[in-house]
Amino acid sequence: STFDKALVDRKEQYTSDDLNLTGLKRIIMRRASLELKENMFVNLGYGMSDGVPIVAQEEGIADKLIFMIEQGSTGGIPTTGLNFGAMYNPTAILDDGYQFDFFQGGGLDIAYLGFAQIDQFGNVNSSRFGNILTGCGGFIDISQNAKKVVFCGSFAVKSQQEITPEGLEISNSGKFT
């Protein structure tokens, strides 16, 4: 990642090139974004779900939503990828303990979360990716207290897909997670 002046200077505007989506992630984010309604408090988890604000901007509704991330930023547009955890033009930056007070109190209307694995019973693992133990972070508090949770992911690793005018074509389903 590189220095992004738009993160520290309100006069500096980020461009749509700073936040772009392609391929399968674009399709997943467009579907996930259909759950958004005006004036929602929206939490975004790390990974796949960080693209929801990009689609909200494209659809012209981002300014009618309150995005929140567990690191404490509220009211701006979260960064994506390895820069996730920062936010463009937040209206507030809270101590994460206070942010979680809001989450645990049921303040979130919707949470978009990624996952490592989901089994046939709907149990979700968010803490281990293959042999890498990342921990659950705020997943438990957020998923258990948000009014609605949308899990964002592909259910498969090493799959091969192609975006066509007709939709998504999966040529190799890969390994299911």
Locations of the language-model features?
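Conserved phosphate- and dinucleotide-binding cores of soluble alpha/beta proteins
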Residues: S1-Q13, G81-T177
